[in-house]
Design a protein with these regions (language model features):
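Multi-pass alpha-helical transmembrane bundle typical of ion/small-solute transporters
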Residues: 1-283
């Protein structure tokens, strides 16, 4: 539940940032006001693409055999893990220039009187965030022990979007307590922890399919100290991949994951930004 709320919240804020930047720029430009209908049309098209992806995933899952579903869930969990890491790296690389890049695309549409270009730009941006949300949510559910109560999952998603609207409003105020930089820094850490959890969940599926050797199973037993099924241990299991009875292969690959993440972030952090543009000035 907490994972669903967090994922919807984080991705919705990012989508609102993109739409907010373009909306503000179009409203401030006399010629740009004609593009507002294309902006909202792009938002609708992007959401439709994300919903279509969700229906495809549900459809594929429904006609698979038990073993096929195990494979599909393993693949989706690992794909979601990779997508989270890619997203964090991309935002770290483009975050400070995102506003300028979006406005440049909008400016080009105005100059060429090509509003369909703006439509496509927005549709791709929203579809990207929506598709990431769909894959993350499916991967999160797949990495767990079951789909859970769909009504509760839907409620968590609605709550996540509501909190995203509030968060976006607070961030747009430009206060010192909550800034775009601090928001992305904190949520990047949480996303990477969640990606580690998705990795471990995917590995659990592969181990159950006898694809991966456990080497030693379990390598330790910490259930007497912290169970991974209740309380704090359950939260750590959901958000960081904690296991009270882990297989050695899972531990080794989890450590390898963090080494790769550290190397990627170090590589991206060492590359100079082209033109820093504070995102909080989007409106």
């Amino acid at each position: 539940m907490e994972q669903v709320l967090f994922i919807v919240w984080r991705e919705s804020v990012e989508a609102l940032l993109v739409v907010g930047i373009l909306y503000t720029w179009l409203r401030a430009t006399p010629e740009g006001k004609r593009g507002l209908n294309y902006l909202w049309g792009g938002v609708a098209a992007g959401l439709a693409l994300a919903v279509a992806l969700a229906l495809v995933l549900l459809g594929v899952s429904s006609w698979l055999s038990d073993e096929g579903q195990e494979w599909f869930q393993a693949i989706m969990s690992l794909a979601a893990c990779a997508l989270v890491v890619q997203m964090v790296v991309w935002m770290k690389k483009h975050g400070r220039t995102l506003k300028g890049e979006l406005e440049s695309g909008a400016r080009s549409s105005v100059a060429n009187d090509n509003w369909w270009g703006l439509f496509v730009l927005v549709a791709i941006a929203v579809a990207r965030e929506g598709s990431e949300t769909v894959v993350f949510l499916y991967g999160t559910v797949s990495a767990g022990e079951g789909g859970g109560d769909m009504a509760k999952l839907a409620l968590a998603g609605v709550a996540g979007f509501a909190v995203a609207l509030l968060t976006f409003w607070l961030l747009q105020l430009g206060g010192k307590m909550i800034t775009w930089r601090r928001f992305f820094r904190v949520t990047e850490i949480l996303l990477l922890l969640l990606a580690g959890s998705l990795l471990v969940g995917g590995l659990d599926h592969l181990i159950s399919l006898d694809v991966l050797p456990t080497i030693i199973d379990p390598v330790w037993d910490s259930s007497w100290l912290l169970s991974d099924s209740t309380g704090v241990g359950k939260v750590l299991a959901d958000f960081a991949g904690y296991r009270a009875l882990p297989a050695l292969i899972s531990v080794l690959l989890w450590v390898a994951y963090w080494i790769v993440v550290w190397a990627l972030l170090r590589w991206v952090g060492g590359k100079p930004a082209r033109a820093p543009v504070p995102a909080r000035n989007a409106s």
